[in-house]
């Protein structure tokens, strides 16, 4: 075998190693999530941590490079809490965990998911504040956090996400005022309702941000 052919083989082998390493780290992150969840219906039985990559697991979608791009875990009767390891899924585009009984807080590490398009955590039992780090999600289009127990203000950092089209934080316990700049100019007020302590400049004139937080 010539030097050129050997070089090609080495490059292919290196690419395979890199792909496997990425898949393993993503598998580790998903295994951490599984350990933190209670799964009475056994919907995560296929999540076998001994496999080389998680792309064969149910409710997980991967791209052609075997990188996880989508988690479809909505409405599966899951409970437990989210884990910071989710922030290692750096190719993830869709995180769907709506209509479960997820508790605890939103990990600030989710702000590392630079390719995330949709973050759907609505209708759970999530508490704590909305992490300002979500403002780093520059590809985000859909942010649905309604129907939880979130407190604190709506982070101003979210107003800097130019791609954001849908924001729904209704039915929480948020406080302060509703941002009106950037994408928030076009978000209907109904997407902020049922937050008794949340005020909107549209209703209050020139309200000062975080007036009652």
From Swiss-Prot:
- Is tRNA processing included in the keywords of this UniProt record? no
Output the Gene Ontology cellular-component terms. Answer: early endosome membrane; late endosome membrane; plasma membrane
Q: Where are the LRR repeats?
A: 90-113, 115-137, 138-161, 163-186
Disulfide bridge positions per record: none
Q: What induces it?
A: Up-regulated by wounding and upon pathogen infection.
Q: Which UniProt keywords apply?
A: Cell membrane, Endosome, Leucine-rich repeat, Membrane, Plant defense, Repeat, Signal
Residues annotated as signal peptide: 1-21
Location of the protein in the cell: Early endosome membrane; Late endosome membrane; Cell membrane
Which GO BP terms sit in this record?
defense response
InterPro entries associated with the record? LRR_dom_sf (IPR032675), LRR_N_plant-typ (IPR013210), LRR_R13L4/SHOC2-like (IPR055414)
Q: Name one Pfam family in it.
A: LRR_14
Top-level taxon in the UniProt lineage: Eukaryota
What is the membrane topology here? Peripheral membrane protein
Role according to the record: Involved in plant defense response.
Q: How does it assemble?
A: Interacts with HIR1.
The molecule here is called Leucine-rich repeat protein 1
Q: What is the lineage of its organism?
A: Eukaryota, Viridiplantae, Streptophyta, Embryophyta, Tracheophyta
Q: What is the gene called?
A: LRR1
């Amino acid at each position: 075998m010539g030097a050129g052919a050997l070089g090609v083989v080495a490059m292919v082998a290196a690419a395979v190693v890199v792909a496997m390493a990425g898949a393993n780290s993503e598998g580790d992150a998903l295994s951490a999530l599984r350990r933190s969840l209670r799964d009475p219906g056994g919907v995560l039985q296929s999540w076998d941590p001994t496999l080389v990559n998680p792309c064969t697991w149910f409710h997980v979608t991967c791209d052609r490079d075997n990188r996880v791009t989508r988690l479809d875990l909505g409405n599966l009767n899951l409970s437990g809490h989210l884990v910071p390891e989710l922030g290692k899924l750096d190719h993830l585009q869709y995180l769907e965990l709506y209509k479960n009984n997820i508790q605890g807080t939103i990990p600030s590490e989710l702000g590392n998911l630079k390719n995330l398009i949709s973050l759907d955590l609505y209708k759970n039992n999530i508490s704590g504040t909305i992490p300002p780090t979500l403002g780093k999600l520059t590809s985000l289009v859909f942010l649905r956090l309604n129907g939880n127990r979130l407190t604190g203000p709506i982070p101003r950092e979210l107003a800097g996400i130019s791609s954001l089209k849908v924001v729904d934080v209704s039915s929480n316990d948020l406080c302060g005022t509703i941002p009106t700049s950037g994408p928030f100019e076009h978000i209907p007020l109904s997407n902020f309702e049922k937050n008794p302590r949340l005020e909107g400049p549209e209703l209050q004139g020139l309200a000062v941000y975080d007036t009652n937080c």
